[in-house]
Swiss-Prot record:
One MF annotation (Gene Ontology) recorded for this entry: mRNA binding
Protein family (similarity comment): Belongs to the bacterial ribosomal protein bL12 family.
Organism lineage string: Bacteria, Bacillati, Bacillota, Clostridia, Eubacteriales
Gene Ontology CC: cytosolic large ribosomal subunit
Name this polypeptide is given: Large ribosomal subunit protein bL12
Subunit (UniProt): Homodimer. Part of the ribosomal stalk of the 50S ribosomal subunit. Forms a multimeric L10(L12)X complex, where L10 forms an elongated spine to which 2 to 4 L12 dimers bind in a sequential fashion. Binds GTP-bound translation factors.
Described purpose of this protein according to its UniProt entry: Forms part of the ribosomal stalk which helps the ribosome interact with GTP-bound translation factors. Is thus essential for accurate translation.
Amino acid sequence: MTKEQIIGALKEMSVLELNEVVKACEEEFGVSAAAPVAVVGGAAAGAAAEEKSEFDVVLTNAGANKIKVIKAVRELTGLGLKEAKEIVDGAPKTLKEAVAKEEAEDMKAKLAEVGAEVELK
């Protein structure tokens, strides 16, 4: 049987039949059909496998009530009035980077309360 004949036979099979063929090949030859995964590095590989635990809090739009948003940004970041105003006026801007999920969601909720649009990345 040639490769073309084998491929032709595989094209005519259903997904269930193909799955059975793959399992039979794995058993027969002692191999796995799983794609090989490149080893990136201990920390990076572990972080990719887990659910994302750190987020960047990004102010995407200040909304209509900029004064309240500026006050909220000052409160959440500890910045001065001038710096907070520059961030709000220059949206989209990152407010905080690598923040724990719970803190990021809390920041997002507080900013949304005063009319700002916030993204967690």
